[in-house]
UniProtKB/Swiss-Prot annotation:
The lineage of its organism: Bacteria, Pseudomonadati, Pseudomonadota, Alphaproteobacteria, Hyphomicrobiales. InterPro entries: dGTPase, dGTPase-like, dNTPase_2, HD/PDEase_dom, HD_domain, PHydrolase_assoc_dom. It comes from Bartonella quintana (strain Toulouse) (Rochalimaea quintana). HAMAP family: dGTPase_type2 (MF_01212). This is Deoxyguanosinetriphosphate triphosphohydrolase-like protein. Keywords: Hydrolase. Belongs to the dGTPase family. Type 2 subfamily. Coiled coil: none annotated. One of its GO terms (biological process) is dGTP catabolic process. It comes from the Bacteria. Residues 73-215 form the HD domain.
Amino acid sequence: MHISKINFNYQARAIYSANPQTSRGRLFYETMSTIRSPFQRDRDRIIHSNAFRRLKHKTQVFIADESDHYRTRLTHSIEVSQIARTLARALCLDEDLAEAIALAHDFGHTPFGHAGEDALNEAMAHYGGFDHNAQALRIVTKLEQRYANFDGLNLTWETLEGLVKHNGPLLGPYANNKDVPIDILQYNTKQDLKLNCFAGLEAQCAAIADDIAYNAHDIDDGLRSQFLTLGQFEQVSLTAVLLKDIEKEHPQLDKTRRGYELVRRQITTMVEDVIKQSQENLAHIKPTSISDVQQAEQTIVTFSPTMAVYEKELKNFLFKNLYYHDQVLSRRNAAKCIVQKLFDCYYKNPNVMPESWHSKTAHLTNQELARLIADFLSGMTDHYALREYQRLFDCTNNFV
């Protein structure tokens, strides 16, 4: 086949989807690939990055080493990308862009999940704070250093916009009223990411895929850990209906397989709901371009009102019964202590950091030093953070 005849399915997209042929491009000019679309190249660069590999040993609720089968940021990101591609295909969007955003959406997370982020944000309180979405942008535009002609991954405008705004506008009447991290504002002077507008539909697919996958894997991990039981899910509206159907169709099924079946059906039910509701939203709004999507006064890829209530109930149940389980809270507090003590140690004596990091600390202001330490700390895996803690504080690992 002649290279020019490769079919990128450009004609299969809806008129309101992102189109790699009309991409806003990259910050640093690069010639177009003859064998991959710009969004495919973004996806591939993300997969080959150091940040992507480190997701293997970063966790969300359960700490690395507690079990080989608990989700990590890596497995979660792959699951999110699978759901995002399904949604994008159903809505005639660019699957590669949805996948790229999904695969990179957790790049900025610290070791030890949200406990680590809370601790680092507290440590950075006087230096601009810490936000995982802003950190993801720092990683893909600066901290990844793999290419000869630029720092970062030099991703397309559309992928960067999706990373920054997949949860909605950061400025304007539809923003969440939180302060916009300085790193995002500074980068926005180089490439206008339209912070007051909604992201494209591919980013919206990635965002809601994250919610679906998050609920599913927390059910699975909660059952696996025995912190949760199937009986408890009979008290939650959505899972109660699903469990009743499973019992009716497979009365002899053992509880382990019933748990797997519950997770599978929960994902399918939510995905089908999002597709149906999003199609209805599109039919109502009638966008004729990406600009119409970005200027819409609402998120378009959503749950139905009924499913939104069910999803909120499920999330509240998981927060109460899993995230605030005594053993999870104990590990969370230990994780926060580790991150806080590591930050304080590096700040007081930067020379204890690896040479590749402490060599950059000369002549830095206090704020610049704190940000460099945040870059170092947030990039750590759970394993590496534990090893650093043991090295610096000469203690045995009693964490897990």
